[in-house]
Curated annotation (Swiss-Prot):
Catalytically driven reaction(s): GTP + H2O = 7,8-dihydroneopterin 3'-triphosphate + formate + H(+)
Residues carrying the site annotation May be catalytically important: C143
UniProt keyword annotation of Hydrolase present: yes
Name the UniProt record assigns to this protein: GTP cyclohydrolase FolE2
Highest taxon of source: Bacteria
Pathway: Cofactor biosynthesis; 7,8-dihydroneopterin triphosphate biosynthesis; 7,8-dihydroneopterin triphosphate from GTP: step 1/1
GO terms (BP aspect): tetrahydrofolate biosynthetic process
Amino acid sequence: MKDVQNEKDPRMVPLKKVGIKDLHWPLKVILKEDGYQSTVAQISCSVDLHREKRGIHMSRFIEVLNKLEVITPQIFEEILDDLIEIMEAKRAHLEIHFPYFIWKESPVSRKKSPLKVDCFVEAEKEKNFSFKIGVRTPVHTLCPCSKEISDYGAHNQRAFVEITVKTRKFIWFEDLVEIAEKNASSPLYTLLKRPDEKFVTEKAYENPRFVEDVARDVALELEKDPRITWYRVYVESMESIHNHNAFACVEKGDFVLEG
């Protein structure tokens, strides 16, 4: 059977990335407490294409991905190595996004409910292996300016803290979620009874935060974590009294700690 993809391309233009995206795939995530959580990931993967080759065999991505069942750094490097070999490439890239549920107790009534966070993993292999993990955690922020100038209350809203890290040691998704929540005005909960609502509302009022505050405090905590070699923090607030959102962003190398 004729192999069209392997035909020599006369244009001689190399391509940096060729691949597939938005592939939905079942997989398991290791829980910090113990066991696994099943989820459905959205996957994108690619390789570079030599200037003399017309195309790649897309089906080979799926064949290689068949070994992806549980998320570990080791399996990602294996997949990238396999892609480089089977595609005769120099570089391979793999990115997955998936929902992850953390069971939380409400602060007063102790009612349990799941909180959805969005997790992602990005891996790349050329000469060296690069591996990033991250979470996008929903939190609660209350505006310090609004509190200061108002006789009653202050505007507050849901916000999202996105943390991306490179690490020298394994780090749990739950650890990153905890860092995001502790530096906001208040965590979010799926289930709140009236005493819980009172607690969360008052906690946020006593702990006002701009997106700038959240981004800086999260960055300082990541900066001091010996497991983390690089990080990026992005905070976005779904402003309740404005027709726009507010955001702040910082990554390792943007500042130097003094003292």
